[in-house]
Amino acid sequence: MTDPVALTADLIRCPSVTPEEGGALSLLEARLSAAGFACTRVDRNGIANLFARWGEKGHARSFGFNGHTDVVPVGARADWRFDPFGAQVEGDWMYGRGAVDMKSAVAAFAAAAMDFVADTPPDGAVILAITGDEEGDAKDGTVALLDWMAAQGEAMDVCLVGEPTCPDEMGEMMKIGRRGSMTFFFEALGVQGHSAYPHRAKNPLPALAKLVDRLAGLELDTGTDHFDPSTLAVTTFDTGNPANNVIPAACRATVNIRFNDAHSSESLTAMVRGIAAEVAAETGIEITDRVSVSGESFITPPGRLSDLVAAAVETETGRVPVLSTSGGTSDARFVQHHCPVVEFGLVGKSMHQVDERVAIAQIPQLKAIYTRILRDYFA
């Protein structure tokens, strides 16, 4: 039997701060290859990715797991109680960067997959698509894996992403979709001048302030069947002006929108640009924008896959998971173009924090859930 706790510790000891591979995928490749998985490194533009398959290529019954081994920076090491790459155990907890997000889940589904195919070889395929580019730009990670799979005729019937999904208690929540995310980068252009002679300048600040105030006051919607209301947040407002007696020539603001399935990035872009044009006309200030879309909203409708995962979670934890679309973006937004996808993982309270830590008992419990999902899927 593969010990997922020991494998978690081994992965934490790999300093895989995005975009560095840090030895994590090489470690997994060696373990999975020894267990009979056909492994392929799908690196792109310096980003490391690993594809592993047990069973027949292109089989109609192919269950996939997706996850990442890259982690966010640790910040100031002096603030940590233990080495962030030491996998130190204290009491019931294992400490380290990536302990929750998400090396424990990668260890759990890798261990579950290896033991499952050894104990009860299924009529089908088990696929692991693991990236080193989820916490970074996410352009050459899961996207690269999916591009490669399509070109090679590799396919998943369904996929489970092992992101931490439970707010407080193991088993309380799974994700069946995610909100979309997009960011507007605005710049208002005026004419610099002395603050004592404002008539000789053209101050862009009031115009941009008017725009972000108008946007911040919008009610985008009241929610949909599976989503909470969309949100809009003003996240930056900058002039880069250190002088208090100079009217700046330009100022910038950033606005982030998390949107549900009542909208698309295209419809929101049109709406926001329309409001910006109105403000520009009212103030006589030119306002430009650049838009970055991290992903559209999506949902895997409740049904076969969510029922499969929920039943396994309830059996192993005694809890019926809530079907949620809350939170930020994940690589499920890419997988959903390939096959139905849901997310289930550990309690995520300490992810990205100093002293990130995982409750050790949850790791074998998660392996048991993933094993049961595989068993029931191939039954």
UniProtKB/Swiss-Prot annotation:
Its EC number is 3.5.1.18. Coiled coil: none annotated. Keywords: Amino-acid biosynthesis, Cobalt, Diaminopimelate biosynthesis, Hydrolase, Lysine biosynthesis, Metal-binding, Zinc. It catalyses: N-succinyl-(2S,6S)-2,6-diaminopimelate + H2O = (2S,6S)-2,6-diaminopimelate + succinate. PROSITE patterns: ARGE_DAPE_CPG2_2. InterPro entries: ArgE/DapE_CS, Bact_exopeptidase_dim_dom, DapE_proteobac, Peptidase_M20, Peptidase_M20_dimer, Peptidase_M20A. Zn(2+) 1 binds at H68, D101, E163. GO terms for molecular function: acetylornithine deacetylase activity; cobalt ion binding; succinyl-diaminopimelate desuccinylase activity; zinc ion binding. Zn(2+) 2 binds at D101, E135, H352. Binds 2 Zn(2+) or Co(2+) ions per subunit. GO terms for biological process: diaminopimelate biosynthetic process; L-arginine biosynthetic process; lysine biosynthetic process via diaminopimelate. Its cofactor is Zn(2+); Co(2+). The active site is at D70, E134. NCBIfam families: dapE_proteo, PRK13009.1. HAMAP family: DapE. Homodimer. Catalyzes the hydrolysis of N-succinyl-L,L-diaminopimelic acid (SDAP), forming succinate and LL-2,6-diaminopimelate (DAP), an intermediate involved in the bacterial biosynthesis of lysine and meso-diaminopimelic acid, an essential component of bacterial cell walls. Belongs to the peptidase M20A family. DapE subfamily. This is Succinyl-diaminopimelate desuccinylase. It comes from Dinoroseobacter shibae (strain DSM 16493 / NCIMB 14021 / DFL 12). The lineage of its organism: Bacteria, Pseudomonadati, Pseudomonadota, Alphaproteobacteria, Rhodobacterales.
